[in-house]
């Protein structure tokens, strides 16, 4: 009798456990829009780390778009075919993805835009920082450092990508209030060290007077510094970003009078995008546009922000653990 009761109890326990074991996970599609710089890699790693924390609830399908808008459209089509419940993308083009995102929404798929906008409202949530404010922070700081006058170079990312366009729009709005600040040249350097160094070197050769650099990327600012060094020109005030390698250089140059400011677009947005997607899938209330103010590193707090023990490739505004950072970046 006792054996029979024990077997029945076990059967009941198994029966109770069965629905939990059989519970379906949310299917999330995540498009890695680009893997060509450390910021985009860390953005993806932040998402991946958050997904690992929720591995009992989510199953992720990854695609890679290699900064190609047509490939991103095809990847979203593929994710729709796979029957995902939500798609998280960083739009490469603000227009090219609109038709396929409409298609996804028509099938009941939640669409979360990560770190970049589109020119329509065909999405369920946007998670980003205010890129116009990012541009304004650096521009206002630079204008004041130059006492409202001087010749500057502007280093942009990639025209057509909303983050780059919005940052430059914000900066231009500020510079309009300072008529004695002359933008000698505004160049696209793709957030890339080498492209920025070449561009700055060429502009220094053609312009005996450059008083400042407005840059919307830490790697580009490093390229600008090295361009000045190669030309044997005295460093000028430059804006940067929260790239650890840039912060290390900044700290090393403070004794020489170098000064900077670094607004940030935190890579933890990748983590936040999954949390927002999960809320949407659970039917919880979510703001359509979650837009954070850009954190700012300046001369007063850079020494506390830099991580001398971690990779130059690392971006300091993160939710990753030190071990996760070391696993992501081996340099």
Functional labels for PLM-detected ranges:
Residues 22-331:
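A residue-level marker of the well-folded mature domains of exported/periplasmic proteins
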């Amino acid at each position: 009798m006792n054996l029979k009761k024990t077997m029945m109890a076990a059967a009941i326990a198994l029966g109770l456990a069965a629905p939990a074991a059989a519970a379906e996970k949310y299917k999330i599609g995540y498009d890695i829009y680009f893997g060509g710089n450390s910021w985009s890699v860390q953005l993806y790693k932040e998402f991946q780390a958050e997904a690992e924390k929720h591995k009992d609830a989510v199953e992720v399908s990854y695609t890679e778009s290699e900064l190609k808008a047509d490939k991103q459209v095809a990847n979203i089509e593929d994710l729709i075919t796979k029957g995902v419940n939500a798609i998280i993308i960083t739009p490469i083009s603000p227009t090219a993805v609109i038709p396929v995102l409409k298609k996804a929404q028509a099938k009941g798929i939640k669409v979360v835009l990560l770190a970049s906008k589109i020119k329509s409202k065909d999405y369920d949530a946007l998670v980003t920082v205010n890129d116009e404010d990012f541009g304004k922070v650096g521009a206002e700081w630079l204008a004041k450092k130059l006492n409202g006058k001087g010749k500057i170079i502007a280093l942009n990312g990639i025209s057509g990508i909303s983050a780059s366009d919005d940052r430059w729009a914000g900066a231009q709005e500020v510079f309009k209030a300072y008529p004695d600040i002359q933008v000698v040249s505004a160049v696209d350097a793709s957030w890339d060290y080498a492209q920025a160094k070449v561009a700055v070197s060429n502009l220094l050769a053609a312009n005996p007077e450059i008083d400042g650099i407005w840059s919307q990327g830490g790697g580009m600012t490093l390229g600008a510094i090295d361009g000045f060094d190669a030309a044997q020109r005295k460093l000028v005030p430059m804006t940067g970003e929260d790239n650890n390698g840039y912060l290390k250089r900044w700290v090393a140059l403070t004794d020489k009078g170098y000064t900077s400011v670094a607004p940030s677009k935190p890579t933890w947005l990748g983590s936040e995008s999954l949390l927002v997607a999960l809320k949407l899938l659970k039917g919880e209330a979510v703001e359509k546009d979650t837009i954070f103010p850009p954190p700012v590193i300046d001369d007063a707090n850079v020494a506390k922000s830099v991580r001398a023990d971690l990779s130059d490739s690392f971006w300091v505004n993160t939710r990753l653990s030190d071990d996760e950072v070391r696993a992501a970046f081996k340099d």
